């Protein structure tokens, strides 16, 4: 029982979850109802962060200067923290500092996706509510209701349901 007590309180981090998912055999993946040739469970853990093209996150011109889009600013923060984390690992910084940077990186990536996270509503560096990907897609001004569901949209995959003329 002593040797199992340590495992009971062990933290589950993304790297450990990825390792566990990668060790699932092909037959077990099929038992989970997944097709191993099309996708495996480890595909659900991001290993690379998608960065949209500049056309999706344009600079906004103001009177004296231009400001970058929220997603561009957040990508810059993520790159900076990732660089500091890599340098800290190479230089042998204390474990607590590495853990703090790792957790801060996770928070920044979560805000990159959804800017309205509970407890993290505003970004303290910019002093305003961030518009992450979720805010750009949902709501009245979002991509779906604001652009794709309008009356004058062609090639959006919508069909018109009408009664049978016979």
Regions found by a protein language model. Give the residues of each.
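Conserved core architecture of multi-subunit DNA-directed RNA polymerases
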Residues: 1-166
């Amino acid at each position: 029982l002593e040797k199992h007590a340590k495992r009971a309180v062990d933290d589950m981090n993304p790297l450990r979850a990825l390792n566990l998912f990668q060790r699932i055999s092909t037959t077990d993946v099929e038992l989970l109802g997944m097709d191993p040739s099309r996708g495996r469970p480890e595909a659900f853990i991001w290993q690379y962060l998608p960065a949209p093209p500049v056309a999706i996150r344009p600079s906004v011109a103001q009177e004296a200067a231009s400001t970058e889009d929220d997603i561009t600013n957040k990508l810059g923060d993520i790159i900076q923290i990732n660089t500091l984390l890599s340098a800290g690992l190479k230089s042998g910084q204390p474990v607590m500092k590495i853990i703090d940077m790792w957790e801060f990186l996770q928070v920044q990536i979560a805000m990159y996706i959804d800017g309205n996270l509970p407890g993290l509503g505003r970004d303290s560096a910019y002093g305003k509510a961030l518009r992450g990907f979720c805010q750009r897609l949902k709501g009245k001004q979002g991509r779906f209701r604001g652009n794709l569901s309008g009356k004058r949209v062609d090639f959006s995959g919508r069909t018109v349901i009408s009664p049978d003329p016979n």
